[in-house]
Design a protein with these regions (language model features):
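Short, flexible loop motifs at catalytic/binding sites
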Residues: 1-223
């Protein structure tokens, strides 16, 4: 009898933990990443990402110096958490090279296949034919598509577009690089966003002409 009660208590505790991880991004992060050391900036980023998840925030720009966990949060853990919460979601992940974007896709895909993820989101898995790291689907109709800045997004629509460091160090040294990224953004992600969708831009600042600078000026003119 006591053993049965203990099992029920443990099961209830696990269900409560799962619910907390499903609803609170930092709880999910700590569950997936036990060695994670939380800082004040993590709390601020997590609060904003949760607002995106709830549909309260449609545009989010995160500017930080390198080595502050911004990519791990925005391009690895966040899309996985969002897929768990909304497994029919269409996510477009972009960064300055296709190779790097595909690498993020591989990490998210691998995370979804772990026991830790399946414990929190037991109904979510990859579609059986999802082999490629840069283009895969969930069992619930969700889609993940990795792309380099400048690449064609024809035929791709996204509920969530994540742009992580759109400028490489090389392109940041040229004015053309900034203009090319802006042209791609206005002709690609912004046009391909589904109604009600969100865009998250994460980057290290390079110049007032970079994508963050262009967006801030654009929003000031047309909020």
């Amino acid at each position: 009898q006591d053993e049965r009660i203990l099992k029920l208590e443990l099961r209830l505790a696990q269900l409560e933990k799962n619910e907390e991880c499903q609803n609170t991004f930092l709880s999910f992060v700590k569950n997936i990443w036990p060695s994670f050391i939380q800082g004040r900036h993590h709390e601020i980023i997590a609060e904003k990402l949760e607002r995106v998840a709830r549909g309260e925030l449609k545009r989010l720009i995160i500017n930080m110096a390198p080595r502050h966990t911004k990519s791990e949060f925005a391009s690895f853990l966040f899309p996985a958490w969002m897929m768990g919460r909304s497994p029919n979601m269409k996510i477009i992940q972009a960064t300055h090279t296709t190779e790097l974007a595909v690498n993020f896709g591989r990490k998210v895909k691998n995370l979804i296949e772990t026991d830790e993820f399946k414990t929190v989101f037991p109904d979510v898995s990859l579609a059986v034919d999802s082999k490629a790291s840069g283009r895969w689907d969930t069992n619930k109709g969700g889609m993940y598509y990795a792309v380099g800045v400048g690449s064609n997004l024809a035929g791709r629509g996204g509920d969530l577009v994540i742009i992580d460091d759109p400028h490489s160090e090389q392109t940041a040294m040229s004015n053309n690089g900034f203009e090319d990224a802006w042209d791609w953004y206005t002709g690609g992600p912004r046009q391909r966003l589904q109604p009600g969708g969100s865009i998250v831009l994460v980057q290290t600042r390079w110049s007032e002409k970079d994508l963050t600078g262009q967006l801030v000026r654009s929003m000031a003119k047309d909020p």
